[in-house]
Amino acid sequence: MIRPAASHPAPKRTSLTAAALVATVGVALAGPVGQAGQAGTDAPATPPATQPAPPASDAALSTAQVRGAQAVKASDPVAADALKLDPVHASSGDDKGEEPARTLPAAASAYASADPDAPVAFPLPDATVTPAAPVPEVPDPARPKISGDTDPTLLRGAIDLYRKGRVADGDRMRDGFTDPAAKALLEWVAIRAGAGIGFNRTVAFVRANPDWPAGPLLRRRAEEALLSEKKAPATVRAYFATSKPVSAPGKFALALALRADGCDADAAEMIRDLWRTESFGRSLEAKVLDAFPDALTRVDHRYRMERALLKDDWESAGRAAGYAGGAYASLVRARRAVEDKSSGAAAALAAVPPSLRSDASYIFSRAQYFRRADKAEAAAAVLATAPSNPDVLVDGDEWWIERRIVARKLLDLGDAKTAYAVASQPAARSPEKRIEAEFHAGWIALRFAGDPAAAAQHFARVAAIAESPISVARAAYWQGRAAEALGQSEEAKRFYERAALQPIAYYGQVARARLGQTSLPLRAPADLEGAERQAFDGRLSIRALRLLGEAGIKELALPLYIDAARDLSDSRELQALGDLATDMKDARALVAIGKLAVQRGLPLDAHAYPTIGIPTYETFTAVPQVERAMVYAIARQESQFDPRAQSGVGARGLMQMMPATAQRTARRVSTAFDVDRLTSDPAYCARLGQAHLGELMEDWRGSYVLAFASYNAGGGNVKKWIDAYGDPRKGDVDVIDWVERIPFTETRNYVQRVMENLQVYRSRLDSRSALLIEGDLHRGAR
């Protein structure tokens, strides 16, 4: 979020720790309820259902083709959230007119973000648990028996009660357990379920379990309770003594407490921050305005309107426009008409009074209107008039997305100069979008505008921001390409060597091939042994994970695994955590643990690419055979090995097959088709998925690049890209550039991720360390 210059830096999402609560506990547990001056609120409002997920591609993609990593377990009660990012909300239709809306699933894929430089998206511990969601019982005769008094049936029953909001009944069942791990687990479930556990009980849990990995959800639950229970100002201020609020209820509660203590200026500043950065509903809006009628100005209301418009939150935008007064409502009508592709969009834009036509919202809408009318040059001219002040842009990342779409359309028209001008103007604010923007500007400058010196500067900026293996390798590889173009061969070699230090990343693998390195080393930490291992295994949270695994409640184990992985910094402990997930046969958790570790530079390469996710199956002989590593590479990207995964557009199972595609493939290989088996029988889904890959390899004459792109975006789109950008199977087409020119961001990312997965899985499954990516990129060459 971009805040006005006068406001404080954005509050960080901090974990709720025992240390942060020490100052609070004494006051909180003794503080009176119903303190004067504290206003309660309704349950924390979520942004409207019409608010879309972040864009995932640069061109219109039919929902039947949007497949990628949208896996969702239909019965999974863990709602979507994204690491270090605000939750993503589902919508229907396309996003920003060109990019398909992404219905981020409840069990978000490890690579659910289409942006390869974005933090990994997971169903994180700060996700919401649906109280009424049943706990699925997964029968498994081979499941080890839980030791002690923790009966798995009783454990599932207690969890189900808490999820249904039956706290008293859940507490009675919990009190029947004697295992401290089971008791702590059930208390954690109760807090997560949002079943009215309350502030004091939440704080008491964290104080009693200082080693429990307390994710952001526990903090949000505590903040909600501070407001709804009208805690005393002293309690509220003590709670926030060491950290800032992370939720709208928390910010409102702190503002009320500050005002009660006479800190009016600080309270007003907190309210302005709340108004500009948080999404919440009409009820809380009214309470904020009633409590602080003089704190917010027309500028604040305009900012809230602008932010809501960029998120397609029409109701909030309309209310904010009303608060701002004047003709701001005309901006909302124009923006919505353009977004909805209404035939009246031009008239709505014309109805905006001249006094508001320099407003950022009007400029954005007008640029999008021209771009959607296939007038990229006109859109670029409008974008050139956009303000540069981030406080005026409000959401620079949304502006960058529009710039990216326009720049790529201009590139397709052969206007590299204007494409570079559009891409190189700074707008993006988040690290992942800044990386994407600088990369695009550098790539266009190097490969299309003939300016390697300018490209080198942009790639250097990427390198300065990059942290994950994917983005570090990409920056270094393209720095090498720019240096080569400048005739700096030794410098280029050093950049390629830097990229090659990331052997599990696509561009790291490409750099290794360029250097003639044929090995693919995978890193692993030392084992945690002796007393340290015993202490680790004895932690209540680790024992709770084992209880969940043995009881078959994987949908609750996953967020706890992720909380633990985020808290741990010792690679040996992360390895031990992964070992536990392996013991529990939880491949999805392994992907999450491994990915979180390698993004921080920790050596958990093997755990990041589990080999336990697909059961043994017989292949069909009626279609060309594909290597087993390819099936794993696809399944990891598509579903994270969740056999019950189902996407918002209907793709199902390990291989995320669309039912119609699976039915055609079943007919081709002469086997019975059963749509339910796609999610109930992982071997069946893997078998059909492998057969479909064989069909695609046949269709594209062995081209891995085209087969992977087709698996994700459909063969029709791939044919269009061949017509537009050339055939990557031909020697006169640079396959690296061809992949980068794929107009769907999701598919660009998908092809690169599956290609890198394939290299790693060859090593993991077949003990082959040879790197074959150069050959894989050029398979099917004519």
Model-derived features: positions:
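Solenoid-like repeat scaffolds
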Residues: D140-G148, D171-A181, I191-A195, A204-P213, ...
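TPR repeat positional signature
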Residues: L154, A182-K183, E187, R219, ...
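Catalytic glycan-binding domains that act on GlcNAc-containing polysaccharides
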Residues: W188-A190, V203-A204, A208, A350, ...
